[in-house]
């Protein structure tokens, strides 16, 4: 589940 690394922080 490395997709979260592509999502910048809010």
UniProtKB/Swiss-Prot annotation:
One of its GO terms (cellular component) is extracellular region. The keyword Secreted applies. It is found in: Secreted, Cell wall. Its main location: secreted. Keywords: Cell wall, Secreted. This is 64 kDa cell wall protein. It comes from Arabidopsis thaliana (Mouse-ear cress).
């Amino acid at each position: 589940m490395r997709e979260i690394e592509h999502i910048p922080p809010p």
